[in-house]
Regions:
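Acidic, surface-exposed loops and disordered segments
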Residues: 1-331
Length: 331
């Protein structure tokens, strides 16, 4: 068992932080900062990237940090590092690293750069139930979070679809939500490459046109009826809807739920299954409470809603340069 060399001599630390930054985040806001010193990596929330309209309590922000943490820990196994994780109630994450040859590499580390949010219409093919059950089992942990799957055509699939429609009605009637969303849309290649964050025209399936052409079109599309028509087509093309719930609803829980989410997304990626978020019912408080009643999960908190299925790969979201989201301290 050996401690790490100083980070200036150890490229593994850069590899670990890079893997962490490949995690998903709301509007691809990348709300994290990494401080690397000797044998530890500290992940802190960057509240300048918060989304107050859609995520006022920072619930999804901390889940994004959990996703980043999971990537880091999985990548560490590939490099034969043992990780010890410490969480504070404020959401500061410290990962202690020890080089150990007895660490078993996780196969999920290899698919971290392949994971993507696929917002396209899927091909309608169903995921075999035994396969999906095995994928859920592979992702599960003992933190109290649970994964529920609802097959297309089932009554609860329809219930959740309706909840998404209701979520769109609420969010698209909120000017603050729409303005926040617009502020994170990157309308063409030039715009996207100037920021390396946000929702690019490419991931939204739009052509690369001048901003003066695309921006008015996007603004005009931010209406509940148009969004519902688009989402309904995408949901109906999917195989299943997946709901992740937790026993508690605090910062530590959100981080751990993010870890489970990322692990499940990587398990799906490894199996060639696409995914995209349907988080509207989890983001609107009254709909979140309604989900608890409709699904008979009164003692659990809905955290993440996904649709999954089969689809062709799509464009990847940009990421900030590592130098912008990290600091490497010398010994």
């Amino acid at each position: 068992m050996t401690a790490l060399k100083s980070n200036g001599q150890n490229p593994d630390l850069l590899t670990l932080v890079t893997a962490a930054t490949q995690a998903p985040s709301g509007h691809n806001s990348q709300p994290w900062f990494f401080t690397v010193e000797n044998n530890r990596i500290i992940i802190t929330p960057d509240f300048t990237k918060a989304l107050p309209a859609v995520d006022g309590k920072h619930r999804e922000l901390f889940m994004s940090l959990g996703c980043a943490l999971e990537n880091l820990c999985l990548k560490a196994t590939e490099l034969h590092y043992h990780t010890q994780v410490q969480l504070t109630s404020e959401g500061v994450i410290t990962v202690l690293l020890q080089k150990r040859e007895d660490v078993t590499p996780s196969s999920l580390a290899a698919v971290i750069p392949k994971r993507q949010t696929n917002r396209s219409v899927y091909d309608g093919k169903r995921i075999d139930a035994p396969l999906l059950e095995s994928l859920v089992s592979k992702a599960m942990d003992d933190t109290g979070a649970k994964l529920y799957t609802f097959a297309n055509g089932s009554p609860l699939f329809a219930t959740l679809t309706e909840a998404v429609m209701q979520g769109n009605a609420v969010q698209m009637a909120d000017p603050a939500f729409k303005n926040e969303l617009l502020s994170w849309i990157r309308f063409n290649k030039k715009h996207s490459e100037s920021t390396h964050d946000g929702l690019s025209y490419a991931v939204l399936g739009a052509p690369n046109l001048p901003r003066w052409v695309t921006e008015p079109i996007v603004k005009a599309s931010l209406k509940a009826d148009k969004q519902n028509k688009t989402d309904l087509k995408k949901i109906q093309s999917s195989s299943d809807i997946v709901l992740i719930t937790s026993e508690k609803d605090d910062i530590r829980t959100w981080i751990n739920t993010g870890r489970l989410l990322e692990r499940f997304l990587l398990v799906l990626t490894e199996a060639g299954i696409a995914n995209a978020y349907l988080n509207q019912p989890c983001e609107v408080p009254e709909l979140r409470a309604q989900l608890q009643a409709d699904l008979a999960i009164a003692k659990a908190y809905p955290q993440i809603l996904l649709r999954i299925g089969y689809a062709k790969p799509v464009a990847y979201s940009k990421r900030k340069d590592i130098k912008e989201v990290s600091k490497f301290k010398n010994e």
